[in-house]
From Swiss-Prot:
Metabolic or biological pathway, per its Swiss-Prot or TrEMBL entry: Cofactor biosynthesis; biotin biosynthesis; biotin from 7,8-diaminononanoate: step 2/2
Record family assignment: Belongs to the radical SAM superfamily. Biotin synthase family.
SMART domains on file: BATS, Elp3
Residues reported in the UniProt entry to bind [4Fe-4S] cluster: 76, 80, 83
Gene Ontology molecular function: any one: iron ion binding
Protein name: Biotin synthase
Length: 337
């Protein structure tokens, strides 16, 4: 390819396509300054890198689609500023304790029947430092899902973990575990929460990796971080060597401290996804919250800017797009591979 017509920073970044080696943080910071139509040139490169290398360490699929179930909702003692489920906030959401196993099975069956092969059980709260009766119920749910839907990839997001629960999840065959660092670690305290530390999340990630559990870990953009800090978060994930990187865009929710936050521009979101792909050529990069509500008409552009996964069927407290619609969406995206 003749790179002479490209911006010098983009031309230099084509090294990722040729070698599969990631860009440096210094290169990422320069790419973040690209204006206007150059963002589409950057997105084009990220799409090529995704197509060549992005099957990911989480599996061989070209597009990683997953669905989650909010199995325990609200009354969380942590004070995450963006979250509707925190009891410190005043969002109007449904509140309930851990659901029964049959409810989880019904939801999982429906998702699997619609063609979704990854299903996650999500609970509100700090997490589980030891195996208590509630955590044991979650383990029993995982076993039931394996028995009834052996081809389903069963995942979980249960908060911070101690060594015993992490070992138990591995023993019960969990496929992926989600726990996000949200922002660059040194801004976690003031941008996200101060009732727990980001180090507790990182310790959980290390425990999961010690037990050979694939880690799904990413962040949220639009909570007050700068682009430079967002890039620092992307490279912090590189150091943690996670398998799946979900990137969320803040959806401001009434009753939370970030309710009036101005949304990020489409161009800035696209640029972030493209840079993340160039920093993580071989990973699954998944677009989660904000796909429908913030990107709207442009959501397909992110799947052509480095993303190769998405959350379908709904989020924890807000509705997403129907799985059938997303299947049609995915089939159209595949024509650009």
């Amino acid at each position: 390819m003749d790179y002479r017509t490209l911006h010098p920073q983009i031309a230099a970044a084509y090294r990722v396509l040729e070698t599969g080696s990631p860009i440096s943080q210094a290169e990422a910071l320069l790419l973040a300054e690209l204006p206007g139509e150059l963002v589409l040139d950057l997105a084009s490169l990220a799409n090529k890198v995704k197509n060549r290398y992005g099957t990911g360490s989480a599996g061989s699929e070209l597009l990683h689609a997953c669905s989650i179930m909010n199995a325990k909702s609200g009354v969380c003692g942590e004070n995450c500023r963006f979250c509707a489920q925190s009891r410190h906030n005043r969002a109007d959401i449904e509140v309930y304790d851990l659901v029964d196993a049959e409810s989880v099975l019904i939801e999982a069956r429906n998702c699997f029947a619609e063609g979704v092969s990854h299903f996650g059980i999500v609970t509100s709260g700090y997490g589980y430092k030891r195996i208590n009766p509630e955590f044991q119920r979650v383990l029993d749910m995982i076993d039931r899902l394996h028995e009834e839907l052996p081809e389903l990839s069963v995942c979980a997001s249960l908060g911070m973990l101690g060594e015993e629960p992490a070992e138990a999840l591995a023993a019960h065959g969990i496929a992926h575990y989600n726990i996000n660092i949200q922002v660059v670690p040194d801004r976690y305290h003031d941008l996200i929460a101060d009732t727990h530390s980001v180090e507790e999340r990182i310790e959980t990630i290390k425990l999961l990796r010690k037990n050979n559990i694939s880690v799904c870990c990413g962040g949220i953009m639009g909570v007050g971080e700068t682009m430079q800090e967002r890039i620092a978060m992307i490279f912090a994930l590189q150091e943690l060597d996670v398998s799946v990187i979900p990137l969320n865009v803040l959806v401001p929710i009434e009753g939370t401290p970030l309710a009036g936050k101005e949304p990020l521009s489409v161009a800035e979101i696209v640029k972030t996804f493209a840079i993340c792909r160039l920093a993580h050529p071989h990973k699954i990069i998944k677009f989660a919250a904000g796909r429908e509500t913030i990107m709207k008409d442009f959501q397909g552009l992110l799947m052509l800017s480095g993303a190769n996964g998405f959350l379908t069927g709904g989020y924890l407290t807000t509705r997403g797009r129907d799985i059938a619609d997303d299947r049609r969406f995915a089939s159209q995206i595949a024509s650009f591979n």
